[in-house]
Design a protein with these regions (language model features):
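Oxyanion-binding/catalytic loops of NTP- or PPi-dependent enzymes
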Residues: 1-180
Length: 180
């Protein structure tokens, strides 16, 4: 979303997103890689016998850890090997997802009638924005570093709480103007 904020007025100029693109998509890239690695273990466990929830949990842990580390050891219960995934390897596995994240940025910018140079501040929203590749893509697109002082998973809740406060008359001095 692109907002104009001034003197207590929050005006939404444009909003765009891909509801079919989320953290689960990134997780499945690691799961697919992991299945290939497990299948390559000599005398290993059959991949079909590993519950999907176990693989997804391992993938999610790896994804989160790769946001702050260059490599992560992935351990799957009942598999006698540890699999190491590198951040650059994960980014290559999910390069198309990163490209897909760019399209809503371009659309919102176009809908708002703005160029990236006209954006003063970039606030990231959602857990996937913790990934360095996503942050780098946004920085390259907007020409400035995203704010790092706001938790990307809490920012939506804070906005919703502010809007609820305004609607309930519990918050004054703030005007929210949605996109028309």
């Amino acid at each position: 979303s692109i907002l104009r904020v001034a003197d207590g007025v929050f005006e939404v100029l444009a909003t765009c997103g891909d509801v079919a693109l989320g953290g689960d998509d990134w997780d499945t890239r690691i799961v697919s890689w992991l299945l290939g690695e497990i299948a390559g273990v000599p005398d290993g466990i059959r991949v079909e016998s590993i519950p999907a929830e176990v693989l997804l949990a391992a993938a999610r842990r790896a994804k989160v850890e790769l946001s702050t580390q260059q490599s992560v050891g992935v351990i799957v219960p009942d598999v006698k090997s540890e699999f190491v995934v590198l951040r650059r390897q994960f980014e290559a596995l999910a390069a198309d997802l990163l490209d897909a994240c760019r399209a809503p940025l371009e659309r919102a910018m176009s809908d708002a009638g703005l160029t990236p140079a006209r954006i003063d501040q970039v606030v990231l929203v959602g857990g996937a924005t913790r990934m360095p590749a996503v942050q780098g893509m946004v920085e390259a697109f907007c020409g400035r570093r995203p704010c790092s002082g706001i938790d990307p998973e809490r920012v939506v809740a804070l906005g919703a709480a502010t809007q609820a406060g305004v609607l309930l008359g519990q918050r004054s001095g703030v005007l929210l103007v949605d996109v028309t």
